[in-house]
A protein has these predicted regions:
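Active-site regions of metal-assisted phosphoester/phosphodiester hydrolases
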Residues: 1-34, 82-292
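A short alpha-helix capping/helix-coil boundary motif
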Residues: 2-4, 49-53, 79-80
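Metal-dependent catalytic neighborhoods of phosphoester/phosphodiester hydrolases
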Residues: 16, 40-75, 93-98, 191-201
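Hydrophobic, Leu/Ile/Phe/Ala-enriched alpha-helical segments that form helix-helix packing faces
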Residues: 27, 68, 72-80, 172
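A short beta-strand submotif of the Rossmann-like class I SAM-dependent methyltransferase core
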Residues: 37
């Protein structure tokens, strides 16, 4: 099974439609089964779509005609591929977008779980974050695919990442009672920092799939200065795919490298090939206590 995660930076990119089509062609050419997306934007002012193509739900806001995930699903459909999709809103971005996370799957989606990681913040506050999990059916069983876009470790003196991950870990631990969990996303926390977000996630028992991979291609996912990392020009690994238990990871590759002509976002993507029949029977995830 092939899995892709990407922070799309949608509608903040030039040539956005062309980049959507590039991604759709890649998904088909690489036979990607499940895709976790972040920064899936739509303008709040554009027309609502009454019956979005292949949409399975998950959002508290309506889908608009310029929704990035909808346009991607439509492009895939035009190319002959059918993908179901889900959506969960996080907050208002740049004063004009519904910023969301989404999951696309060519395998059946059997359940959807929106995860509010910031109940103390309102929808118009950038501090509000949400994740989503979708129960995916494979030939050998089901697993939960989750997508998230975390806050920075320190947000104006507030430990937002730790608070968010505590709630996320609790929700994913509930998911893990019924099926394995695969979590992809933009964690806004560099892997080399030993006392920040990456360390917190792995301390809960989540396994970095790159460490399990038989073959790896690339490591860092951001190679230049981006929004939220102003003044930081060093290459860093801030996008990850974690699993709640051991499994066979055949390959783990950085794709659409952000510092290459193939870039379609200000983040690189991660493409994994895993064996969905290889999940260990026991989850390693121990949920964390909510920080105050």
């Amino acid at each position: 099974m092939r899995f892709l995660t990407l922070n799309t930076h949608s509608w903040c990119e030039i040539h956005q439609i062309a980049k959507i089509r590039t991604l759709a062609k890649f998904i088909i050419d690489q036979q990607v089964d499940v895709i976790a997306l972040q920064e899936v934007n739509q303008l709040t002012s554009t027309p609502v779509v009454k019956e979005p193509l292949n949409y399975r739900g998950g959002a508290g806001v309506p889908v608009h005609e310029d929704n990035y995930a909808l346009l991607l699903v439509q492009a895939l459909n035009e190319m002959g591929a059918t993908y179901e999709w889900t959506l969960t809103e996080t907050h208002i971005g740049w004063d004009r977008y519904d910023e969301c996370v989404a999951i696309l799957s060519r395998l059946p989606i059997r359940g959807i779980k929106p995860i509010d990681m910031s109940p103390e913040y309102g929808y118009h506050q950038v501090q509000r974050r949400a994740a989503q999990a979708a129960l995916i059916e494979t030939e050998t069983g089901t697993f939960w695919c989750a997508t998230t876009h975390m806050s920075w470790w320190d947000f104006d003196g507030e430990p937002l990442f730790a608070q968010e991950y505590a709630r996320l870990s609790q929700a994913l631990a509930d998911c893990a009672l019924t099926a394995p969990v695969l979590l992809g996303g933009d964690f806004n926390s560099a892997a080399h920092l030993s006392d920040e977000g990456y360390a917190l996630v792995t301390s809960s028992g989540m396994v970095d799939t790159r460490s399990l991979a038989e073959h790896t291609d690339g490591e860092n996912t951001v190679h230049r200065e981006i929004a939220g990392w102003e003044g930081s020009t060093d290459a860093k690994r801030i996008d990850f795919v974690f699993a709640d238990r051991l499994l066979t990871v055949n390959s783990h590759a950085v794709v659409f490298r952000d510092n290459s002509p193939e870039a379609i976002s200000d983040h690189s993507g991660l493409l994994l090939e895993i064996d969905p029949s290889s999940w260990a029977p026991q989850s390693l995830l121990t949920p964390l206590t909510t920080q105050h």
